[in-house]
């Protein structure tokens, strides 16, 4: 892997690039890590991104977005959007077309992938054609009155409980 800095409006957004062992560079997975918007970084997801690159044969660009509570909303989605905009608007950097770039994330990162897609649509600067949302955080109702049966059936007895999700 190699590290790079995306500079946006006076701030620096670190990214880490992973190339597959096959040396194929015909597409990119733009990865946003999970962690409830408060934990995780490109170091903690290093192995995940390296494996993702090798298994899929794609380049992976992992974004080290700013975390809460030190950085209030919308810091994280703005960082992710800035990196995506850089990649989509300077396609010569990777010699790609928009079709070859997929936004991907897990949990809070999946939420960010969806948010970046919506921001791109609304701002009209670029438009991602594909996203992969791995167990996305898309609803905020995980309390006792949650309408989701899975919260009641699986909200206890696991590492990430319904109560912990509410705390995020």
Segments (PLM) and residue ranges:
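Alpha/beta-hydrolase superfamily serine-hydrolase fold, recognizing
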Residues: 2-168
């Amino acid at each position: 892997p190699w590290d790079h800095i995306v500079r946006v409006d006076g701030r620096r957004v670190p990214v880490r690039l992973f190339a597959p062992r096959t040396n194929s560079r015909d597409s990119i997975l733009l990865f946003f890590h999970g962690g409830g918007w408060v934990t995780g970084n490109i170091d903690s997801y290093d192995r995940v991104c390296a494996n993702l690159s090798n298994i899929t044969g794609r380049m992976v660009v992992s974004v080290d977005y700013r975390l809460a509570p030190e950085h209030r909303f919308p810091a994280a989605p703005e960082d992710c959007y800035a990196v995506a905009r850089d990649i989509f608007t300077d396609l010569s950097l990777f010699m790609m077309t928009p079709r070859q770039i997929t936004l991907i994330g897990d949990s809070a990162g999946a939420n960010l992938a969806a948010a970046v897609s919506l921001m791109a649509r609304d701002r009209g600067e670029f438009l991602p054609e594909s996203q992969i949302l791995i167990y996305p955080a898309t609803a905020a109702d995980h309390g006792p009155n949650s309408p989701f049966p899975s919260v009641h059936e699986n909200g206890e007895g696991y590492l990430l409980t319904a109560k912990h999700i509410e705390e995020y």
